[in-house]
């Protein structure tokens, strides 16, 4: 079984993970013999490292004789061996100062907290607040003419969130601003009291296209317009800080990889995969098959947006990030973001 390691192997695995996190270099048995809590013969440590490699907890680095943790090794470490660095408590005061800025709206506090998280850890920080897209219903779709060719469409949710989209008509097409008002009324009747996520599916359905078939010359533009509004709702609660620091990494120097990574962030895939987790979660890029990065880790933890909804705050960084420091900062931040409801 995965947790059936001897105490000595546990100490060696913990030492490899934490030394690799601190120095970013493969760890050899000679280095481990100098650690005060590993008072074992060099041959014994070397033998156990070979066994840990055979068991899949460590892997050989091609450029040196040292070893680095594997996905399995990191997983075991995070589940069984992690001890939190109590020295990070000196950083909590700066978190308290951000959280106590009650004059800001909650969204602004989250943004400031993410910026601080990025500064404290040096990793990209992300958060999803209230899941407006999946938890809000359309209350009303309104149409406001501006002139004979321009108008504004408003979508208002039952939670009071509002998005608008400007629309311009091509005068060469056989549809007037008054025709458009009629079709928006049809859409309003069809989508009122539907969840935003449900409405997005309806808009793209054959049924919807048949419903507005009379306005075929404007059909594609209308569908694109509503999808743009729904996309705005979906991204309204998404926050980032320190993305540029990830883009400075050598493995992201390829423009095509940068494009994929940014698209990944915009689609919120990195956080969506963990929204159903109730506690601290970790995911490796190798196991996700989502990110263009190799050896990437995503650490996330939930916080209470309100008594009925949870958000998620996370850091994205290399798999060798300093877990004893990063995890207690994440945990403290999540607890205190939840207290914004008090």
Swiss-Prot record:
Coiled coil: none annotated. It holds the Pfam family HrcA. Gene3D superfamilies: 3.30.450.40, Heat-inducible transcription repressor hrca homolog, domain 3, Winged helix-like DNA-binding domain superfamily/Winged helix DNA-binding domain. One of its GO terms (molecular function) is DNA binding. Keywords: Repressor, Stress response, Transcription, Transcription regulation. The keyword Transcription regulation applies. InterPro entries: GAF-like_dom_sf, HrcA, HrcA_C, WH-like_DNA-bd_sf, WH_DNA-bd_sf, WHTH_transcript_rep_HrcA_IDD. One of its GO terms (biological process) is negative regulation of DNA-templated transcription. Belongs to the HrcA family. PANTHER family: HEAT-INDUCIBLE TRANSCRIPTION REPRESSOR HRCA. Negative regulator of class I heat shock genes (grpE-dnaK-dnaJ and groELS operons). Prevents heat-shock induction of these operons. This is Heat-inducible transcription repressor HrcA. It comes from Onion yellows phytoplasma (strain OY-M). The lineage of its organism: Bacteria, Bacillati, Mycoplasmatota, Mollicutes, Acholeplasmatales.
